[in-house]
A protein has these predicted regions:
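Bacterial N-terminal signal peptides
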Residues: 2-11
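Extracytoplasmic metal-acquisition and chelation regions
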Residues: 14-126
Length: 126
């Protein structure tokens, strides 16, 4: 499903005008990297967060909202990884979203304080 969401990005991107790239925004850099690899030159992909940012409790800025409103698609991980995303998304009028982990069965965390809970880091799941 993760790749399905990214493939959707690519197919939509090819429908964009030849002079203007399809604009995709992601919730964090790992999804942005995957989307860039799928879409290639057909899309302009950027991440709301910067490399190294704490994704779980990120605090979006008004500038983040403004940038996201200019996107044609927003990609989010889901699985409650981005605790801030649903509130953030309420400020975006009509920007389609794809939850890239839809349909993914997460692996359980095997140690530490979250042992036994589902791992929301879907890109790390086998």
């Amino acid at each position: 499903m993760l790749l399905g969401g990214l493939a959707l990005t690519c197919s939509i991107a090819f429908q964009a005008s030849a002079t203007e790239k399809f604009k995709v925004i992601t919730t964090f850099t790992i999804i942005a990297d995957m989307a860039k690899n799928v879409a290639g030159d057909a899309a302009e992909v950027s991440s709301i967060t910067k490399p190294g940012a704490e994704i779980h409790e990120y605090q979006p800025t008004p500038g983040d909202i403004k940038r996201a409103q200019g996107a044609q698609l927003i990609l989010a991980n889901g699985m409650n990884l981005e605790l801030w995303f649903q509130r953030f998304y309420q400020h975006l009028n009509g920007v389609p979203e794809v939850i890239v982990s839809s349909g993914v069965t997460p692996v359980g965390i095997t140690e530490g304080p979250y042992e036994g809970k589902p791992n929301p880091h879907a890109w790390m799941s086998p």
